[in-house]
Amino acid sequence: LMGRPGHIGWCRAPSQGDRLIAEEMIARVGMDGYEDRQINELSGGQQQRVFLARALAQEASVYLLDEPFKGVDMQTEKIIVHILKEMESRGKTILVVHHALRTVPLYFDHVAMINRRLIAAGSVRDVFTEENIEKTFSPSKGV
């Protein structure tokens, strides 16, 4: 229910609808059955899934995810990618901070390459080039 405060309001109890949304999002990320566990009892990947469920429960139109694949196993990574694609198909805007270059073309359609300033932005096909990667990750060329 931590993702629902904007919908619940201050000093109000969550509605049955809020509880159902929270349960749906927990199930969507494959964490049903873990609802009664403390966050410190979960693995890093399980924590990432719970954080994603919390974000999804907000029912926002724009999501900013800071390295959602960090510290997760391959199974969790696949689940997160599937959820992101599903969100995209529902018209949601998703901005992801991501540093694993090998998976950029597999997971994303558009990219903004930044090194203190915008180096390049556009479709992965057009922008994710060796030249732009070098400009982005080379300390002397990105500035």
Task: Label every PLM stretch briefly.
Residues 111-123:
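H-loop (His-switch) and adjacent beta-strand-loop-beta switch element
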Residues 104-106:
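A short, surface-exposed alpha-helical micro-motif characterized by mixed small hydrophobic
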Residues 74-76:
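Helix N-cap at the start of a conserved alpha-helix in ABC-type nucleotide-binding domains
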Residues 63-66:
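Catalytic Walker B motif of ABC-type/P-loop ATPase nucleotide-binding domains
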Residues 38-42, 46:
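Conserved ABC ATPase signature
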Residues 16-34:
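Conserved ABC ATPase "signature" region
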Residues 98-99:
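H-loop/switch region of ABC-family ATPase nucleotide-binding domains
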